[in-house]
Amino acid sequence: MHARHAAVTATTESPCMASLMNRVETLRWDDHRYYHQCRINQTLHLVSAISFLVAYAWLLIDPAVSALIGWCVGMVTRQSGHIFFEPRGYDQVNGASDAHKEAIKVGYNMRRKALLIGVWLALPLLLWASPGLFGLITPGAGGYLHDLGLLWLALGVGGLLFRSVHLCFLRSPMWALAWALKILSDPFHNVAIYWRSPFALLRGERLDPIEAGHAPRSA
């Protein structure tokens, strides 16, 4: 009975949905093998993923606090792993130079991340200098941090939408949707594949023994 149900499900699965999920898996695998070889980086991504899951839950309570958690904990730990610990230079595992990996990066490569982080760092200063952001917003009753959280939330949503629309023209709407889905589901996926990384790091394993063509196990 179960086999029959699985067969029916497989035959009735939308080709469009299958194509979308294949793209998501391709993006996930390329992201892992190219940019997450260091166990320290993986561990920081685990911390980041957990904080983003907390931020997701806090969206229902207070979106401003959710954004503060996501940016100050999630993004700081995530990008620290990339900037300070992930190997740069020639990638022996995948046979690719750092310049090549930066050029083919679907989402935010280091140059685009630098621009995004620059805006993120500038917003607190701008809001401090002008609580009304030079007439663009009305200061809320929640105070400086609450307004900052809402601005950072707008920045995060805007960054996701901007790159998604950009990818519609660079690649296709399907790739844009796949990237957006991959980004939004990254916290769940990162927990699934990186929960072992702290234990591997404690054993002295600094680099993940990644094999080209083999995706990481999630359980």
Regions found by a protein language model. Give the residues of each.
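Hydrophobic alpha-helical membrane-embedded segments
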Residues: 61-86, 158-170
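Short hydrophobic alpha-helical segments enriched in small aliphatic residues
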Residues: 3-6
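C-terminal halves and exits of single transmembrane alpha-helices
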Residues: 109-133, 192-199
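Alpha-helical membrane-embedded segments
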Residues: 147-168, 187
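Membrane interfacial helix-start motif at the N-side
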Residues: 26-56, 101-117
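Alpha-helical transmembrane segments and their membrane-interface junctions
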Residues: 119-140, 204-214
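Membrane-proximal soluble regions of multi-pass membrane proteins
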Residues: 14-32, 83-107, 165-219
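Helix-coil boundary and interhelical linker segments in multi-pass alpha-helical membrane proteins
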Residues: 54-69, 125-150
